[in-house]
Amino acid sequence: MVRRIASATPMVQSPMSPLGTTYCVRPNSVSMNLQRRPLVIASTDEAKVTIIYAGLLIPGDGEPLRNAALVISDKIIAFVGSEADIPKKYLRSTQSTHRVPVLMPGLWDCHMHFGGDDDYYNDYTSGLATHPASSGARLARGCWEALQNGYTSYRDLAGYGCEVAKAINDGTIVGPNVYSSGAALSQTAGHGDIFALPAGEVLGSYGVMNPRPGYWGAGPLCIADGVEEVRRAVRLQIRRGAKVIKVMASGGVMSRDDNPNFAQFSPEELKVIVEEAARQNRIVSAHVHGKAGIMAAIKAGCKSLEHVSYADEEVWELMKEKGILYVATRSVIEIFLASNGEGLVKESWAKLQALADSHLKAYQGAIKAGVTIALGTDTAPGGPTALELQFAVERGGMTPLEAIKAATANAPLSVGPQAPLTGQLREGYEADVIALEENPLEDIKVFQEPKAVTHVWKGGKLFKGPGIGPWGEDARNPFL
């Protein structure tokens, strides 16, 4: 059993170690654990301030600036403006300096799934067939790739994001900020049910009323029926560390035997889910395709709608009136259409084909109507997330600047009151910043080339750039 180092634990350091590393020996019931802990040594030449000069600065919300500069002090953006207007106190301080062609906020993907499933399975059975340890290993790689590709934040809407976020936050692995729902909530015979397996098998693993001794209840799905079960389901996700609650409010594509046009959960169940989430200062994100599910989710008070395939003018006006975020997830549809449904069971492929055109029309209509939109792909960490920017422009009808706003400034709205102060290059915001060698306003597909992302700062720390190792470490000393 591996445990974190406690401050009271005796420390033993090897004075001859060339790694400058402190070790902790901690006994437990299984073994004597030898753990490495970075030795932090104060340095008089340590950079206190980072100054980035940019030929073009895209703020996330607002017009781009030419010949601009941005100053990071610790983790916070301290100055944004003309290169000529940098306060002298920053120029006099100890600093690291970078000059880049294009600077902008780090990207968000607002609809991810931290499943880490085995590719051998092509339906929901993979969630039960894959060991969580294997899932975690795959997710660690994907999170590293995400940061290298310029994605500094993910919203996970069904998966192990709560658990992976802890490993990222304590520095065990490298990845974006992760804001997770924990398990997605589904009714029996709903979008989160696994129709290929016996009901007892599914409920025994994912049923909210069936926790086993020693079981964390930390799967990607949670089956609940009735107001008391859904109330408990919300509380269990918050116990895991969920920053948002995800509910399956209509049938879906990947669930083999349900109908995307039909609403799921009763109005009373949806109301309790929203109320219980609000009690803990969380919003609810609803998976919806058909209008019945869309309207039920809106009436219940859900603040983020996913897919929204059969939306119309009535829906768009209600979303604007109530300040509801629209996350279309066009990428997953385009990917399956291009591959002729490769990887889908026949029932899912038929459903996707049936709703693909309506989904696109709804997306285009929402953009024209002025609904607030954030971008999400419905894929996994490290996947082709930048495709969503391309489809927002080429299929949805956004301008490149609008697509960037949807992937940056609008994105924190997807976690409601739990949102960090990020997504924009503004003074006082967290320094989640990326640099590009090409102008995305001229070619939105530039985000699809990882080499085009030359620098990545997350929370003010440089994770990708000259002199930085592949895991965000100082290449001169990988343990600092």
Swiss-Prot record:
Activation and inhibition: The Zn(2+)-specific chelator 1,10-phenanthroline inhibits the enzyme activity.
Residue positions binding Zn(2+) 2: 246, 287, 307
Any GO CC annotation of this UniProt entry: extracellular region
Subcellular locations according to the entry: Secreted
Function noted in UniProt: Carboxypeptidase that catalyzes the release of a C-terminal amino acid with specific catalytic activity for aromatic amino acids such as phenylalanine. Is able to degrade ochratoxin A, one of the five major mycotoxins most harmful to humans and animals that is produced by Aspergillus and Penicillium species and occurs in a wide range of agricultural products.
Domain characteristics, as noted in the entry: Each subunit of the homooctameric enzyme folds into a two-domain structure characteristic of a metal dependent amidohydrolase, with a twisted TIM (triosephosphateisomerase)-barrel and a smaller beta-sandwich domain.
Protein name as annotated: Ochratoxinase
Gene name per UniProt: Am2
